[in-house]
């Protein structure tokens, strides 16, 4: 049997609680069957290599780091305030990082109709 370690990527949606899953696979009538089996210990460095910013136990940024991922996060640190995180095509009202979060906040000068008007190319037809 071949065992494959399923490395859990550290995301808030799928928190890591000190255990992982080993997938045991085998062949049954030429079909590969995978059976999950819970384990509690991981090889040293297995989780550390998944995301260098993330503490594998708490699934939060490591000590001394600011963020794990996001458009305003690079090398585990928030990008400087004023860094463009979302460039617009027509109106020049780009979205900028704040320096205190990894999210890319919407430019407050944009109106709701601007977002609707230029967000995507329309395809299809109008029925009247």
From Swiss-Prot:
Intrachain S-S bonds: 53-76, 67-73, 72-97, 85-104
Residues making up the signal peptide according to the UniProt record: 1-20
Short motif (Cell attachment site): ranges: 89-91
Tissue specificity statement from the Swiss-Prot or TrEMBL entry: Expressed by the venom gland.
Propeptide: 21-46, 112-128
Pfam families given in the database record: Disintegrin
Chief location bin: secreted
Subcellular location: Secreted
Gene Ontology annotations for the cellular component aspect, listed alphabetically: extracellular region
InterPro entries according to UniProt: Disintegrin_CS (IPR018358), Disintegrin_dom (IPR001762), Disintegrin_dom_sf (IPR036436)
The entry's keywords: Cell adhesion impairing toxin, Disulfide bond, Hemostasis impairing toxin, Platelet aggregation inhibiting toxin, Secreted, Signal, Toxin
GO terms of molecular function: toxin activity
Domain Disintegrin span(s) in chain numbering: 47-111
SUPFAM superfamilies: Blood coagulation inhibitor (disintegrin)
Domain of life of the native organism: Eukaryota
Family to which this protein belongs: Belongs to the disintegrin family. Dimeric disintegrin subfamily.
Note from the entry: Negative results: has no interaction with the collagen-binding alpha-1/beta-1 (ITGA1/ITGB1) and alpha-2/beta-1 (ITGA2/ITGB1) integrins.
Function: Inhibits ADP-induced human platelet aggregation. Antagonist of alpha-IIb/beta-3 (ITGA2B/ITGB3). Also avidly binds to the laminin-binding beta-1 integrins (alpha-3/beta-1 (ITGA3/ITGB1), alpha-6/beta-1 (ITGA6/ITGB1), and alpha-7/beta-1 (ITGA7/ITGB1)) in an RGD-independent manner.
Record note on quaternary structure: Heterodimer with subunit beta; disulfide-linked.
Name the UniProt record assigns to this protein: Disintegrin lebein-2-alpha
Organism expressing this protein natively: Macrovipera lebetinus
Lineage of producing organism: Eukaryota, Metazoa, Chordata, Craniata, Vertebrata
């Amino acid at each position: 049997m071949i065992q494959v370690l399923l490395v859990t990527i550290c995301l808030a949606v799928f928190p890591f609680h000190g255990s992982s899953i080993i997938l045991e696979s085998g062949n049954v009538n030429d079909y590969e069957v995978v059976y999950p089996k819970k384990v509690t210990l991981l090889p040293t460095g297995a989780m550390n290599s998944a995301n260098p910013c993330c503490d594998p136990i708490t699934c939060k940024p490591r000590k001394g780091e600011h963020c794990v991922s996001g458009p305003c996060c690079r090398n585990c640190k928030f990008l400087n305030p004023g860094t463009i995180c979302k460039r617009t095509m027509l109106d020049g009202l780009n979205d900028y990082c704040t320096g205190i979060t990894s999210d890319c906040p919407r430019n407050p000068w944009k109106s709701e109709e601007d977002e609707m008007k230029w967000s995507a190319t329309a395809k299809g037809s109008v029925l009247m």
